[in-house]
Amino acid sequence: MLFFIDTANIDEIKEAYELGVLAGVTTNPSLVAKEADVSFHDRLREITEVVSGSVSAEVISLNAEEMIEEGKELAKIAPNITVKIPMTSEGLKAVKALSDLNIKTNVTLIFSANQALLAARAGATYVSPFLGRLDDIGHNGLELISEIRQIFDIHDIDTQIIAASIRHAQHVTEAALRGAHIGTMPLKVIHQLAKHPLTDKGIEQFLADWNK
């Protein structure tokens, strides 16, 4: 499973990149709104200068024609821009049109296997099921990952699964076990993955023994 960071903060992206594990970035309007010091397009340019992998940039339009035009403009920013489209009927039309233009798409706000299958058949490069938000309403977000992966494997679908709305390290482990191709997460979760109390204890013991 590859690691993406879910943020529009350039300092966080650089910090994750320096760890040597970052394969891409996902952003959304809420994350971009926190970055008041720079325009959306300028921030995307900054990100693509740091990260050579996929950088998802979300449209804010709700009808297909406007999504398509917005997606075309976003794709001009850099060759590694992936246009993020919400999972709606209008969104599916936009995904089909952009896919026909060889523009990569990431269909977001996926909450069912049927939605993921529709998005894949429309030509989505990625689908993003939201784990944490499903957990919040008492549903099993991780089981959804399993369902989508099984369907994609049975039908030989190349669309990649991005496990999104990751809240903690266990989400990452379980998503990887269930076949998600990618996990996108906040910087704090990436740091959580690197930590274990026994690792810290072992380092302390090694240093104590060395200094005796």
UniProtKB/Swiss-Prot annotation:
Keywords: Cytoplasm, Pentose shunt, Schiff base, Transferase
Annotated metabolic or biological route of this protein: Carbohydrate degradation; pentose phosphate pathway; D-glyceraldehyde 3-phosphate and beta-D-fructose 6-phosphate from D-ribose 5-phosphate and D-xylulose 5-phosphate (non-oxidative stage): step 2/3
Top-level division of the source organism's lineage: Bacteria
GO cellular component: cytoplasm
GO biological process: carbohydrate metabolic process; pentose-phosphate shunt
EC number: 2.2.1.2
Catalytic reaction annotation: D-sedoheptulose 7-phosphate + D-glyceraldehyde 3-phosphate = D-erythrose 4-phosphate + beta-D-fructose 6-phosphate
Molecular function as annotated in GO: aldehyde-lyase activity; transaldolase activity
Family matches, as Gene3D superfamilies: Aldolase class I
Signal peptide: none
Location (main, coarse): cytoplasm
Pfam family, one: TAL_FSA
Top-level class of the enzyme under EC nomenclature: transferase
Cellular localisation: Cytoplasm
Active-site residues from the entry: K84
Family of the protein in this entry: Belongs to the transaldolase family. Type 3B subfamily.
Alphabetical list of HAMAP family matching this protein: Transaldolase_3b
Functional description taken from the UniProt entry: Transaldolase is important for the balance of metabolites in the pentose-phosphate pathway.
Name by which UniProt lists this protein: Probable transaldolase
Protein species of origin: Bacillus velezensis (strain DSM 23117 / BGSC 10A6 / LMG 26770 / FZB42)
